[in-house]
Amino acid sequence: MQKAKTTAIVWFRNDLRVRDQQALTQATLKHNRVIGLFHIPETWLKETPWSFKKMEAFRAQFLLQTLTQLQEDLAKLNITLWVTVGNLKQTVQQLQEKYGVTDLYAQHEWTQEEIDDAAQIPNNIKTHWNYDQFLFHPDDIPMEVSNIPEVFTVFRKKCEKQSHVRPPIGIPDPMPTENLIHETPELPTLEKLGYENISNDARTAIPFDGGEAAAWKRIQEYFWDTKQLSFYKKTRNGLLGKKYSSKLSLWMAFGSISPRSIYAEVKKYEKTITKNESTYWLIFELIWRDYFKYISLKHGNKIFKIGGILGKSYEWKTNNRLVQKWIDGNTPEPFVNANMRELACTGFMSNRGRQNVASFFSKEWHLDWRIGAAYFEAMLIDYDVHSNYGNWMYNAGVGNDPRDRKFHISWQAERYDPNNTYQKTWLQTTLF
């Protein structure tokens, strides 16, 4: 393909990788100059009305690790990654004036803050959007987005029967060495972004770094070295350690690995090692992730409304004292407390824990579920807007749970932590 003598920006969003990266691949094929760009909005660094930042330190640290890796990987392709904090429009205009940018390639996002970001791109730059975060591409599902079923099982069965997963694409060929730009802003540090340095807690279930290389290292470890994928369905409700689940959500949240790549690795594993309920269940969870993305694509800003996608009215409270007790792990439920303290100390919590603390927050204390969702957004390293708000709506009874269940938390603790090992790990104070 003959390249146009033009300059394109690849605006990285939650797709921070070089392998199976549509925007990057398209830009490098069509333009003789390509610049990478990542923008950190100032809103991420500011406090919410509930006294925590929109992005707290654990997620910020993982993001910076991810950007460091991406910068190195792009440099191998002779592409510069320009990381900017603050005014996106001004940065793009500066790049346009200095390098004659004509085109911009990016992953399409449809939630409100991301729409507002996209509106800052100057009108005289041609934009190329792609749907690069799905397992099942929107063009390949057997229904219109407006007709996405409100029950997950219906969606899953239709997609499994009538759709397909596109094969992942490789890493693009390197650009000429003259494509590199040597005068670029330095990557910010945690301190420059306004955070204190954090240290890893020895009890963490996620002793991992951010970035594409770390994502593939985890695939190698969890799939091929230990073959823990073969037992995923049996262990996935665990609470302690790195082995009980894949933890791939960490890297998927930043797009350091694509769902298509994970799917392809599972299929390879099924051909060469074993195919069982556990290997299927990892794919099942990828479909859940897709489903919440489609639900938000269908319903738009309803996912941020107090009545959720159902428009249900409950008497929600905004009691700051109770919210703080929940955040501090100081509720009447030890199982909730242990999970909240793990989150505060590590930026992570198991899926089982998330469901229980969300159910307690919304169904026992009847607090505005959106405050809980905002706290998860701040704290969870693997925060994904669609899964986070989809799951919170589900647990609060305003989303996709047709039975509107609530968790019996003491029973959950007895079942999943029968010897109190998890609760002792996070609640027992050290004696000196």
Predicted stretch roles:
Residues 1-167, 341-342, 387-391:
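Trp/Phe/Arg-rich N-terminal binding region typifying the photolyase-homology
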Residues 15, 56, 87, 111, ...:
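Secondary-structure junction/capping motif
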